[in-house]
Amino acid sequence: MAKPIRVLLYYKYVPIENAEQFAADHLAFCKSIGLKGRILVADEGINGTVSGDYETTQKYMDYVHSLPGMEDLWFKIDEEEEQAFKKMFVRYKKEIVHLGLEDNNFDSDINPLETTGAYLSPKEFKDALLDEDTVVLDTRNDYEYDLGHFRGAIRPDIRNFRELPQWVRDHKEEFMDKRVVVYCTGGVRCEKFSGWLVREGYKDVGQLHGGIVTYGKDPEVQGELWDGKLYVFDERIAVDVNHVDPIVVGKDWFDGTPCERYVNCGNPFCNRRILTSEENEDKYLRGCSHECRVHPRNRYVSENDLSQEEVVERLAAIGESLDVTPA
């Protein structure tokens, strides 16, 4: 039996004239049909995830497919029991994917319509994973990798996507002469990053077409060789990919036990995404460090209306005190 809510993940690199007005008009339409989600619009294209019931999402797909240049836009569809978003946002940005090239002296930005890596089907990507002479590079943020990733994929030592070009240049000698294939959630980041690899001089560059989401839905590979869960940027947080032999790879921030539950650090000035159980969240006041646990703006403390005495008691239980520097 079909679930009542559909979640649509999509993007398309296509020139959009007067993109700011396009974004405003798009938001008005989405609100008029009761759609929820988050959409980025830029001169270079559109990138979004939205959710709604069958009728609402069908209206939206029909509307998008009626727009010039978007007739063939590819929607990746998940069925869920509940909405994946609480509100509707459509925002104009300079880019739908910010690789940070111009900000970091990496010359101009990449246009995927002109330069991008070769598309690999799920089966071709699986073959690449099994090929010892192929480098498989995860292009996502560190917390995304930690929740789940392809078996054997390289985890760049970076916090976010914008740091990836510099990391690759720093490790260029390790795989410049090898075949390099990249992957991301739905494909939008890889379109641009694989193009940058081509421009950097890599001769054999591939990308997982449709991203991890498509790989998990493919009837032939069924998500095999993916370990853990897929981090998604909505209320679901994590979704399944491997339907053959799933395992848990995420580890609790505090004790290293298997974990697939993400929270943001209680310190609003840190906000690090950490994997932790509800028990450890309570025990450590949702703080990723001592400094975050005792921060005067700790959200866990305020949300749970903890008194100073209760905070002191919990800190004492883990061998800490209210001092900024732990004993």
Curated annotation (Swiss-Prot):
GO molecular function list: oxidoreductase activity, acting on paired donors, with incorporation or reduction of molecular oxygen
Active site positions: 184 (cysteine persulfide intermediate)
CDD domains (UniProt xref): RHOD_YceA (cd01518)
Signal peptide positions (record): none
Pfam family, one: UPF0176_N
Reaction(s) this enzyme catalyzes, per UniProt: uridine(34) in tRNA + AH2 + O2 = 5-hydroxyuridine(34) in tRNA + A + H2O
GO biological process assignments: tRNA modification
Entry EC number(s): 1.14.-.-
Top-level division of the source organism's lineage: Bacteria
Family matches, as InterPro entries: Rhodanese-like_dom (IPR001763), Rhodanese-like_dom_sf (IPR036873), Rhodanese_C (IPR022111), TrhO (IPR020936), TRHO_N (IPR040503)
Keyword field contains DNA-binding: no
Rhodanese domain segment(s): 130-224
Keywords: Oxidoreductase, tRNA processing
Claim: Repeat is one of the keywords in the record: no
Family in the record: Belongs to the TrhO family.
NCBIfam families attached to this UniProt entry: PRK00142.1-3, PRK00142.1-5
General function of this protein: Catalyzes oxygen-dependent 5-hydroxyuridine (ho5U) modification at position 34 in tRNAs.
Protein's name in the database: tRNA uridine(34) hydroxylase
Gene designation per UniProt: trhO
